[in-house]
Design a protein with these regions (language model features):
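Single conserved hydrophobic/aromatic residue that forms the stacking wall/gate
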Residues: 1-12
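Conserved beta-sheet core of the metallophosphoesterase superfamily
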Residues: 13-71
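A short C-terminal boundary segment appended to hydrolase-like catalytic domains
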Residues: 65-152
Length: 152
């Protein structure tokens, strides 16, 4: 099911290209419950368009490890009034972690940079994803989001 997949179907890439060609400068996809790639594509008129296919869940009480990793984008947009152009001049992805205790209690969100192995070892999602750890989250992030968009 592509809605839960970190991979992208051609339909999403084609739709992003259409939106870019129709004039979008930034495209943010939603719904898959997991993070998906971030990239620049070129619109028909030559503009560079930022595409964020999915930021995943910001906060949820779902029961699978990959759905605990979400993200926020920090985007700088620059407008040149003389040339009448607008462009994304900086785009950085910050990982977030939805954390909950056993029985889906005490749900909260952390920046991935502030998350620890100790927290991960107590996460309620370990009942369905025993391998869940800080390394698991960092590996997932680096597998999906290219270094160009990662902070640090």
């Amino acid at each position: 099911d592509l809605r839960m997949s970190r991979g992208l179907g051609d339909v999403y890439k084609r739709q992003a290209q259409k939106l870019a060609d129709w004039g979008a400068d930034i495209i943010i996809g939603t719904h898959p419950h997991v993070i998906q790639p971030v990239e620049y594509i070129t619109a028909a008129d030559g503009r560079k368009v930022l595409v964020i296919y999915s930021l995943g869940n910001f906060i949820s009480a779902q029961d699978r490890g990959p759905r605990m990793l979400g993200g926020m984008m920090h985007i700088t947009v620059t407008k040149d009034y003389r040339k009448n152009t607008t462009e994304v001049t900086k785009a950085k992805f910050t990982g977030t972690v939805t954390h909950y205790d056993s029985g889906f209690s005490n749900v909260r969100v952390y920046n991935l940079a502030d998350y620890t192995d100790a927290l991960a070892s107590r996460h309620g999602v370990r009942s369905t994803t025993p391998s869940f750890s800080l390394n698991y989250l960092n590996s997932l992030l680096h597998d999906v989001v290219s270094e160009e968009f990662l902070e640090g």
